[in-house]
């Protein structure tokens, strides 16, 4: 019987390594030894202790940040700046053994965006994910509705009272929150209906990107979009029986428009199906892609009850799941048949973890900014290694995110193909302890491999 019962006793090296593999982007042999002496409760609590927020990202061309400045004419091209924002997110994982960075990727996968957004908006979105990495998924869902990057990505900024756009409300329901259930009638997906999408599309009219960044969210202190009541459908919105036929009162002020969003989010997150869908996402991300009827009944349903009763606290859900006997495959007689070693790493996890475990030496970011930021991270790590291995980091093919997290039955096997597998092997061949990184050579694309394929 699958069980959320607390795992007792010290982890030992095997289970400590399992926990670190699932919860971080990388760790060392020293980390394994340290975590081996901890109980699951102690270890997970440590992983949920996050580092302080680092300074904003640096543009190697100027040696300064461009966030919050008016120096665009001095900076690197916008495409490069976006990659330097990703460096800001990921490089901290080399010095911090915590759940933070994996949770930020989880939130990106579940509130998908891409690199068509501006670098400053990308930074603000990652800061938003960082802020709620162990906070309330419900609260975050409301904040994302006003996120400048999301307003652009799913066309909300084009939505008016006269011409509502259905893109964002459709994806919010189907992909970000409650999920689509079995279709039981024309336009009826059990958990919501086409009528609900149309009503929600009217609710999300009139919100505009604020490129001046003067609209500040009081809870996060981050910029957000700008409500425009004159372009908003100010009438009431009534939803289907899937949402108990609730009516949300239309607003005719900035505050009224924001209250409509809060009321809508509250309505969606009042449903048990929303909590269960989010818990399935957590399970597939941290434990295993396969959710059997037993897992649904004994893990997903009780975990969803815990999540919902605690205002969708990700911290409480993570503690419950990652401290459980089930996570360590200790809830049946065979302790090695299902969970441990049962997931294929994405390229980001594989490459970052390999670099950290084997102590691959990276260029010095202080004395050689160009080689560190541009040649290693941008040209080689993001634009070559991860891309050729099947993961365009923070730039999934569509709004559903990376197929390995949702496309059944293959799921995480999708990370591996005849083409992508070769890059995993080639990278591993250059990850020797103390290696300065043959894959750090410049002009990879010009030579075809230049250090990786030799």
Task: Report the location of each language-model feature.
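Active-site substrate-binding loop specific to GH73 endo-beta-N-acetylglucosaminidase modules
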Residues: 1-3, 36-39, 48, 55, ...
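Cytochrome P450 heme-thiolate monooxygenase catalytic domain
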Residues: 105-113, 279-280, 300-301
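Short, flexible active-site-proximal loops enriched in glycine and acidic residues
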Residues: 99-103, 114-120, 162-164
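Structured, charged N-terminal subsegments at the starts of enzyme catalytic cores
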Residues: 73, 81-98, 105
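Flexible, low-complexity segments enriched for small/polar residues
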Residues: 5-13, 17-28, 271-310, 318-454
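Hydrophobic alpha-helical membrane-insertion signals
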Residues: 9-68
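Short, solvent-exposed loop/edge-beta patches enriched in aromatic
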Residues: 12, 27-28, 52, 94-103, ...
């Amino acid at each position: 019987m699958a069980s959320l019962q607390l795992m007792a006793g010290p982890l030992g090296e095997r289970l400590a390594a399992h926990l670190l593999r699932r919860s971080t982007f990388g760790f060392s042999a020293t980390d394994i030894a340290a975590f081996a002496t901890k109980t699951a409760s102690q270890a997970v609590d440590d992983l949920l202790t996050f580092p302080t927020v680092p300074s904003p990202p640096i543009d190697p061309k100027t040696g300064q940040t461009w966030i919050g400045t008016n120096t665009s004419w001095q900076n690197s091209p916008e495409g490069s700046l976006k990659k330097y924002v990703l460096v800001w997110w990921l490089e901290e994982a080399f010095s911090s053994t915590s759940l933070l960075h994996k949770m930020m990727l989880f939130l990106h996968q579940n509130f998908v965006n891409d690199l068509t957004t501006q670098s400053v908006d990308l930074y603000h979105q990652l800061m938003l994910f960082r802020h709620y990495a162990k906070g309330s998924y419900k609260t975050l869902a409301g904040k994302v509705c006003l996120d400048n990057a999301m307003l652009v990505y799913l066309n909300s900024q084009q939505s008016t009272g006269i011409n509502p756009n259905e893109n964002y409300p459709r994806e919010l329901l189907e992909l970000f929150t409650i999920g689509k259930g079995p279709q039981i009638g024309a336009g009826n997906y059990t958990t919501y209906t086409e009528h609900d999408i149309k009503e929600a599309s009217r609710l999300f009219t009139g919100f505009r990107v604020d490129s001046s960044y003067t609209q500040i969210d009081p809870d996060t202190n981050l910029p957000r979009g700008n409500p425009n009541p004159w372009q908003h459908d100010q009438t009431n919105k009534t939803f289907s029986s899937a949402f108990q036929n609730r009516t949300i009162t239309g607003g005719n002020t900035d505050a009224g428009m924001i209250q409509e969003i809060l009321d809508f989010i509250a309505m969606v997150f009042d449903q048990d199906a929303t909590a269960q869908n989010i818990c399935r996402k957590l399970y597939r991300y941290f434990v295993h892609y396969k959710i059997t009827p037993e897992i649904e009944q004994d893990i997903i349903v009780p975990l969803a009850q815990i999540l919902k009763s605690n205002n969708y606290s990700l911290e409480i859900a993570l503690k419950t799941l990652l401290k459980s006997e089930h996570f360590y495959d200790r809830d049946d007689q065979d302790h090695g048949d299902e969970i441990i070693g049962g997931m294929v790493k994405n390229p980001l996890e594989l490459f970052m973890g390999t670099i950290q475990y084997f102590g691959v030496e990276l260029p010095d970011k202080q004395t050689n900014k160009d080689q560190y930021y541009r040649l290693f991270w941008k040209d080689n790590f993001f634009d070559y290694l991860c891309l050729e291995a099947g993961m365009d980091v923070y730039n999934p093919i569509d709004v559903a995110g990376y197929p390995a997290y949702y496309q059944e039955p293959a799921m995480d096997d999708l990370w591996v193909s005849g083409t992508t597998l070769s890059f995993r092997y080639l990278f591993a061949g250059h990850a020797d302890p103390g290696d300065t990184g043959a894959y750090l050579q410049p002009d990879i694309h010009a030579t075809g491999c230049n250090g990786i394929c030799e």
